[in-house]
Amino acid sequence: MRHRKSGRQLNRNSSHRKAMFSNMAGSLVKHEIIKTTLPKAKELRRVIEPLITLAKTDSVANRRLAFARTRDNEVVGKLFSEIGPRNADRPGGYTRILKCGFRTGDNAPMAYIELVGRPATSEAVQEDAQSAE
């Protein structure tokens, strides 16, 4: 029986899952939007939200905790210098999941997961303008 067991297994063992979500969290912090399957996006939300909450108060101890979870100094730096202060007044809900259809090949439901307060890049604005014409 699997009563009160939280989290998705995603057909991986625990070390693979931990490494995958560590890498995905780092990618999300670097790029601020990533495309993945819907179940992975929903699970990633459980990993990244506490990291951003941790980044709201900058201290050596919090930086070490974030590094222990991501293993990337560049990610920790961006987390504490940009993303944490940007969400200082937001009480949770730092990510948004947008469904984007199904993957060709295996028909897996796909989704974009993005950070809520992310600035619109000039490249994305230019692409939207070109596609609208």
UniProtKB/Swiss-Prot annotation:
PROSITE patterns: RIBOSOMAL_L17. Coiled coil: none annotated. Keywords: Ribonucleoprotein, Ribosomal protein. Pfam families: Ribosomal_L17. GO terms for cellular component: cytosolic large ribosomal subunit. GO terms for biological process: translation. NCBIfam families: L17 (TIGR00059). Part of the 50S ribosomal subunit. Contacts protein L32. This is Large ribosomal subunit protein bL17. It comes from Pseudoalteromonas translucida (strain TAC 125).
